[in-house]
A protein has these predicted regions:
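A small/polar active-site loop signature that marks catalytic segments
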Residues: 232-368
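Beta-lactamase-like hydrolase cores
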Residues: 26, 30-108, 114-121, 185-192, ...
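Active-site-adjacent, His/Asp/Glu-enriched structural segments that form or flank metal-binding
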Residues: 145-208, 217-224, 231
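Second-shell loop/turn segments in exported
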Residues: 68-77, 115-124, 167-176, 186, ...
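Extracytoplasmic
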Residues: 97-99, 117-119, 125-128, 143-145, ...
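Bacterial Sec-dependent N-terminal signal peptides
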Residues: 1-28
């Protein structure tokens, strides 16, 4: 049979399908028989962009392939059209084997738009980071900074360029601490005219407790180490600092150890990073260490709680949940990143948190720019491209085995601002769950 005849037959088959089948056909299949100019073409992101999200826990790099179009019935209101579209999406056979908790809220009208199993307890994966981010901003404020401080005790002897005393490096669990900040510490010591230290280099680890991993983390995951002193996101700070001092001609007689700095210690320098800068990478790249660091900033409450624990953070999150009019005992908060298998939230909780953030400009104006943008950046860079949802949906993704989630904001076709949460559990293929979520977003945007 000639190619032209095959093409004609396939097109006839496609056009003969029921409307719902036409709407939800996979574009990879449609592209086989559409004219060449209509094929879906995808491009590989450059190496720099890939590196920028190298710590991403959304490990599935599969590109979207859903070709979605929706009719608009002029005899129905916008809300009735949206409800009809969403009801059709929820006829998907996917939901025969996969759980879905969904809530969609119209922020402009401050009314419920759609809900489905919104109170079903589900594992959120990395949309847990939305909970952590909003709780941290609510408790600490948008001007909060992560700190790493250097102190000394004893006497400075100018004639011998000696510190007759000790150095203390006080950790604040700053995940952005890199070589630039390390060099600043060394330069500050040199500026004091110190080339020799008769005492000890102490690491003050009192910012948090000694637990290095979160509850419910799988042993075979790429788990971050939870330490107050981080260098290049690793637990190698003191060794690297000691080495850097030696390289710059600064010697220490008694090596290094751990001890909390005394109240009479003198500050040499403090390096800082803003909560907004940390949050941007945490959300765009879905960085688990950054999220756990923010979880412990919340737990520490700006340094008020020494040896802060995950339970301290949970208490503050529970307080926020009560402010939303919900019962915190209905949820399980294990960690700040969503890595834990013990986290159980609902779509309702996530939406009410996003609504709360929107109603508080200090939170919303810091949170919104950190969210991945559909078809543009972060973990949404390959999703919903060439659709009305592209450059519109700003949302946090979540992916662990069996779980895919999406929560954030979008502007609907009627100009209304929407917040939403979609949590899928029990799926063997994350791509199918992502496409389900994409269709919901496109239905709202188109």
């Amino acid at each position: 049979m000639k190619i032209k005849q095959i093409t004609t037959l396939l097109l006839f088959t496609f056009l003969s399908l029921p409307l719902a089948a036409q709407v939800y056909l996979d574009s990879a299949e449609v592209a086989r028989f559409l004219p060449y100019k209509n094929k879906v073409v995808t491009t590989t992101q450059n190496a720099l962009e890939q590196d920028s999200i190298s710590s991403d826990d959304e490990t599935d790099d599969e590109v979207d392939s859903t070709l979605t179009a929706f009719d608009y019935d002029t005899h129905l209101s916008w809300k009735e059209n949206i409800t009809q579209r969403l009801n059709n999406i929820f006829q998907s056979p996917l939901l025969q084997t996969v759980q879905a908790g969904v809530m969609i809220w119209d922020l402009t009208d401050d009314t419920l738009l759609f809900q489905h199993n919104e109170q079903l307890h589900l594992r959120p994966a990395s949309t847990m980071k939305c909970v952590t981010a909003i709780a941290a901003l609510d408790k600490l404020g948008s001007s909060y900074t992560y700190k790493t401080s250097l102190y000394y005790t004893g006497n400075l002897v100018d004639s011998t360029q000696t510190l007759e005393g000790d150095l203390y490096i006080v950790g604040g669990m700053d995940p952005m601490f890199r070589a630039t900040e390390m060099n600043q510490l060394v330069a500050a010591i040199k500026n004091l005219g110190i080339n020799h230290i008769t005492g000890t280099l102490y690491a003050d680890l009192s910012f948090k407790d000694s637990k290095q991993f979160g509850r419910g983390w799988c042993w075979d995951d790429k788990n971050p180490t939870l330490t107050p002193l981080l260098y290049n996101k690793k637990d190698i700070f003191v060794e690297q600092f000691n080495q850097k001092l030696r390289q710059n001609g600064i010697t220490i007689d008694s090596g290094y150890g751990t001890r909390q700095y005394p109240s009479n210690a003198q500050n040499i320098i403090t390096t800082t990073h803003s909560i907004g800068d940390v949050m941007r990478h945490m959300m765009k790249a879905s960085d688990n260490l950054y999220a756990e660091s923010m979880f412990y900033q919340l737990a520490s409450n700006g340094g008020i709680n020494k040896h802060a624990s995950a339970n301290n953070a949970r208490i503050y999150i529970q307080q926020l949940i009560r402010k939303l009019g919900l019962n915190p005992s209905n949820y399980k908060i294990a960690d700040g990143s969503g890595l834990s298998l013990y986290n159980y939230l609902t779509a309702e909780l996530e939406v009410k948190l996003l609504r709360y953030a929107y109603q508080n400009p200090d939170i919303y104006n810091t949170l919104l720019p950190t969210l991945p943008i559909a078809g543009v950046d972060g973990t949404l860079r390959k999703r919903m491209r060439n659709t009305p949802a592209a450059r519109n949906v700003k949302a946090k993704t979540g992916t662990v085995v069996g779980v895919t989630s999406l929560a954030g904001y979008l502007t609907a076709a009627n100009g209304h601002l929407i917040c939403f949460s979609i949590i899928n559990n029990g799926g063997l293929a994350s791509g199918a769950m992502r496409n389900f979520q994409n269709k919901i977003c496109i239905a709202l945007c188109q």
